[in-house]
Curated annotation (Swiss-Prot):
Its EC number is 2.3.1.274. This is Phosphate acyltransferase. It catalyses: a fatty acyl-[ACP] + phosphate = an acyl phosphate + holo-[ACP]. Belongs to the PlsX family. The lineage of its organism: Bacteria, Pseudomonadati, Pseudomonadota, Gammaproteobacteria, Alteromonadales. It is found in: Cytoplasm. One of its GO terms (biological process) is fatty acid biosynthetic process. Pfam families: FA_synthesis (PF02504). Pathway: Lipid metabolism; phospholipid metabolism. Catalyzes the reversible formation of acyl-phosphate (acyl-PO(4)) from acyl-[acyl-carrier-protein] (acyl-ACP). This enzyme utilizes acyl-ACP as fatty acyl donor, but not acyl-CoA. NCBIfam families: plsX. HAMAP family: PlsX. GO terms for molecular function: phosphate:acyl-[acyl carrier protein] acyltransferase activity. It comes from Shewanella piezotolerans (strain WP3 / JCM 13877). GO terms for cellular component: cytoplasm.
Length: 342
């Protein structure tokens, strides 16, 4: 394992340095080979670096800027007018080879726009995709993409997403021949719109992707597949609905376990199991969405992430950098194109 550097937008998200800096300190304690460049207002950042050990501080660099991309900034406005923002500088550090990955909890649209313009897409990739991990009943991760970077997609784009998702599962989780499916309104080949049907036909012709066919919404968490592909409109609604249901179940479970004397006693007895169950359903446990298909690594954290959730996103960015995810995707695409043309 070699040293790596993470560029971190310290000002992004709902809480800025109050969350990003303490989470960074935790990550540095966990990984002695990690260095972090914190981009943002040095005065605010320094306030949260006070408890850091000298050895930890030596692995932190600060790029000072007071400009921030706000949550209300439109992507085009951010591109044109936020050229000294903490988000943009963090991405530029990846572009210039000074960092191997970038992480931000800021404005998603601005992050995607800046990343695509500054880092460019990989050869053979038309559009980057936003992908995140979901829980499954067998405790294996399931990747869902796209989550909103591309509201509408043609069949070729869905095909590219399937290839990238397959490589992601192999690279990050070491899954052997990940099972890939297209999210659809039915499993029959005649179901779905033209784009989904045509994407399925393309994938059937590519042996390098273990395409299993269509999958319906009620099978997303079954663990029967490793990668689920859809356009960003469907994916974003699916993700947000999942997070809402998880919070509802958590609320109802906590409420139910406080009603009645004997129930409260039982709850204390099985508290460790309840805690484990709630943790599995907690969306923060899966924090960190990757913008894949770019020539560099960009990870988006939830804006409302707490310290533990932001640490999860840091760990994801580090893992993708260590395993050279963009290069792995590029190599796989090159192999597929060679087979198609041979």
């Amino acid at each position: 394992m070699t040293n790596l550097t993470l560029a971190l937008d310290a000002m992004g998200g709902d809480f800025g340095p109050r969350i990003t800096v303490p989470a960074t300190l935790q990550a540095l304690r966990l990984n002695p080979l990690l260095k972090v460049i914190l981009v943002g207002d040095q005065v605010q950042i320094d306030e949260y670096l006070v408890p850091a050990e000298p050895e930890i501080k030596r692995r932190i660099e600060i790029k000072h800027t007071t400009e921030v991309v706000t949550m209300s900034d439109r992507p085009v406005h951010a591109l044109r007018n936020r050229k000294q923002s903490s988000m943009r500088i963090a991405i530029e550090l990846v572009r210039d080879g000074k960092a191997q990955a970038c992480l931000s909890a800021g404005n998603t649209g601005a992050l995607m726009a800046m990343s695509k313009v500054l880092l460019k897409t990989l050869p053979g990739i038309d559009r980057p995709a936003l992908v995140s991990c979901l829980p499954a009943v067998n405790n294996t991760p399931v990747y869902l993409l796209d989550l909103g970077a591309n509201v509408s997609c043609d069949s070729e784009t869905l095909f590219q997403f399937a290839v990238m998702g397959s490589v992601l599962s192999e690279t990050v989780d070491k899954t052997v021949s990940p099972k890939v499916a297209l999210l659809n309104v039915g499993i029959e080949e005649i179901k779905g719109n033209d784009q989904v049907q045509q994407a399925g036909q393309l994938l059937q012709q590519i042996p390098q992707v273990n395409y299993t066919g269509f999958i319906e919404g009620d099978e997303i968490y079954s663990g029967n597949v490793d990668v689920i592909v859809c356009d960003g409109f469907v994916g974003n609604i699916t993700l947000k609905t999942s997070e809402g249901i998880a919070r509802l179940l958590t609320h109802q479970l906590k409420k139910g376990l406080t009603e009645g004397f004997f129930v409260r006693i039982l709850a204390k007895i099985i508290a460790p199991r309840i805690h484990s169950l709630l943790n599995q359903m907690n969306p923060d446990h899966y924090n960190g969405a990757s913008l894949i298909g770019l020539r560099g690594i960009v990870v988006k954290s939830h804006g409302c992430a707490d310290e533990a959730a932001f640490l999860q996103a840091i760990c994801l960015a580090v893992t993708e950098a260590q395993r050279r995810l963009p290069q792995m995707i590029e190599d796989r695409l090159e192999s597929i194109l060679l087979d198609i043309n041979s």
